[in-house]
């Protein structure tokens, strides 16, 4: 593993409260669950953990509450090779929470309270201007306030820091933001939201990628689930297949892919090789339960790839 440029991740931190039960309660009904766990999540934190465990030189800009969960999350992130200096503790606020019910068929219903995530303001981003300006890449998602994502993208763009955006959860985005993005990684749903093109095959993916190229984005990677990734650089596209594994839990597959992908690109791996590295990380993650507990370490990814040769 060669020395690589530095990465800044900006995003969300949640505590996931997960209750498994046979069937969802109807209004007014109380249902007994069969398994409960608290796991750390949030798209930003998941991607930061994936990058840290993949070997990136990474700092994380985020917010937690001044509660015990926030303290536990910060301690855990520090053990994942992440510089948590830019993680702000918001007085009087709770750490972000996701309440997740999972039924016997594996379906889920989720309610989220942003908590301290909503306090990740443009002012807090501005306080990290030098860190963003000096980084090789900035990786963001859409669980943070959009004005803060925009502020960080502007700083990065002005200083030739690569801007990578995972546009999740799916939403429409202003062209002003998209014009600042160098690498975008939507799934099919997110690509349709951004382009108006339903992505059902490689031809659709190529059309959607072209729309995003026309908005100023050089590298478009549309994730296609088990079919892999449609990778398009300035209109030159190809599908890079993933690995076949027996999936147990796909909760953090996309986040693992994104964190590992940017790590590999910062090591100057060619794009197809970086995607293959990210596919390997995600393939390992889906064979394990939970969000961050499923994210593999670099040694595991390298060993997985060695077995595929």
UniProtKB/Swiss-Prot annotation:
GO molecular function, one term: ribokinase activity
Keyword Translocase attached: no
Cofactor list: Mg(2+); Mn(2+)
UniProt: K(+) binding residues: 249, 251, 285, 288, 290, 294
Entry's cofactor comment: Requires a divalent cation, most likely magnesium in vivo, as an electrophilic catalyst to aid phosphoryl group transfer. It is the chelate of the metal and the nucleotide that is the actual substrate. Also active with manganase.
Principal subcellular localisation of the protein: cytoplasm
InterPro entries (UniProt xref): Carboh/pur_kinase_PfkB_CS, PfkB_dom, Ribo/fructo_kinase, Ribokinase, Ribokinase-like
Entry annotation: catalytic residues: 255
Regulation: Activated by a monovalent cation that binds near, but not in, the active site. The most likely occupant of the site in vivo is potassium. Also activated by ammonium ion. Ion binding induces a conformational change that may alter substrate affinity.
Bilayer-crossing regions: none
Classification via Pfam families: PfkB
EC number: 2.7.1.15
Name the record gives this protein: Ribokinase
Native source organism of the sequence: Escherichia coli (strain K12)
